Design a protein with these regions (language model features):
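Conserved phosphate- and dinucleotide-binding cores of soluble alpha/beta proteins
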Residues: 1-310
Length: 310
């Protein structure tokens, strides 16, 4: 889906640049749906009319997603992460309520920058508040970079011909060697489970898929490459009304490992922060049990002893 054509004959794939540009480059014929409600964004997201074989026009409303409701658990996690983000940091914000909770805790920061996969309402709010300026970025200074957008109608209007925002293909935004050129890159992403070694299951639980492969591991590695960078994997300590611990001895068989133990840095729950990078198996296990829900710590400790980790 593309924006209306500009005076130079270009359409903008602003809301979903991601893989679309690569598909267009390889397509024998390009058919565009041109929607009058799609913003015209800047960046490497434009298709010239000469490349288009056919098009159809529509004015259907664009799918909207507002900011999620933030409860005390999400708020606590957000505060832990926000306290570790310095002024001038460049941020990658993943999808979900907890990353959004982090954004809401950043209103007292100064001169933050954005190099991310998804741009949403939380980022727009910080721009409007003067918190995000991109002034101290040393890679694409002055510009926010993203590959797709998901939010409200206000966000889509904010994107329209905004010189501070550029939309690029996902192989550009998510390249760890490019994103990692930002000093102080702080990557914030959610997961469903973390095991004693720090492996994260963000896409499936066992053989049941819940999400596709996103940019989590890309940006964890980018933050590891960044001078002063940090990556945060965030999750509530429990699921299903406190009946299941999300800190587990091992991931279920069949679980897709989204972030591996050798890449993980910080894991954050409402009970604190576990710093895992460079730590031994015993130290990782102790740190993760320390941020598990108190009702499960004894059980997890016994499991760790049986696994000869403690």
């Amino acid at each position: 889906m593309a924006s209306p054509m500009d005076e130079h004959g270009y359409f903008s794939l602003s809301l979903g640049t991601d893989y679309t540009m690569a598909a267009i480059e390889r397509a024998r014929a390009v058919v565009l749906e041109v929607n009058s409600n799609v913003p015209f964004a800047n960046g490497d997201c434009h298709v010239h009319i000469s490349r288009v074989a056919a098009l159809c026009e529509s004015d259907d409303p664009i799918f909207e997603v507002g900011l999620p409701k933030i409860g005390p658990v999400q708020e606590a996690i957000g505060k832990y992460v926000a306290d570790m983000i310095p002024d001038g940091a460049t941020l990658q914000i993943g999808y979900g309520g907890i990353p959004d909770a982090v954004v809401m805790q950043l209103t007292d920061k100064r001169d933050l920058g954005i190099h991310t996969e998804m741009v949403g309402d939380g980022i727009m709010t910080l721009v409007e508040a003067g918190v995000i300026t991109n002034r101290r970025k040393n890679y694409h200074q002055g510009k926010m970079l993203a590959t797709f957008a998901l939010g409200s109608k206000k966000l889509y209007q904010f994107m329209n011909r905004n010189p501070a925002l550029e939309m690029h293909p996902v192989d550009f935004t998510n390249d760890p060697f490019l994103a990692g050129q930002n000093d102080n890159l702080h990557a914030i992403n959610a997961t469903m489970q973390v095991d004693f070694m720090g492996q994260c299951g963000s896409e499936s639980l066992g053989y049941t898929p819940y999400s596709g492969t996103g940019g989590q591991s890309d940006f964890v590695r980018a933050a590891n490459r960044s001078n002063g960078g940090k990556s945060f994997i965030v999750l509530p300590s429990t699921a299903k009304n406190d009946t299941i611990s999300r800190i587990v001895p091992t991931l279920q068989p069949g679980t897709h490992v989204s972030t591996g133990k050798n890449d993980i840095n910080y894991v954050v729950t409402e009970y604190g922060v576990a710093q895992l990078r460079g730590k031994s198996a015993k130290q990782r296990c102790q740190a993760l049990i320390g941020i598990a829900h108190p009702d499960f710590r004894g059980e997890l400790h016994e499991m760790a002893k049986k696994m000869k980790l403690l």
